[in-house]
Amino acid sequence: MEERYPLTIPDSLLEKMNAQMLLRSQVETVVRTAEETGTMVLDEAQGIYYGHGRFGSVTIWAAWRRTDAGPELCNVYSHRVVVKEVL
């Protein structure tokens, strides 16, 4: 069994994830991958990092803060839009 990534998720966001049918493991993967690869954006004024990942037809965006205890989720959202280049 894979060890859970130490991402703190407030109950309100767990409820939001459940309503949007987003898996905790997918959100953890977004944050872990962004942290490991550096593919994230930092809002310096707020101290919030943003990263995203694609899971099938769904793109999940996560916003988190770094804390002494590890990352803490601030927001999460998703979309099912695919942008294709038209020539």
Regions found by a protein language model. Name each.
Residues 1-87:
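Ribonuclease/tRNase effector modules and their secretory precursors
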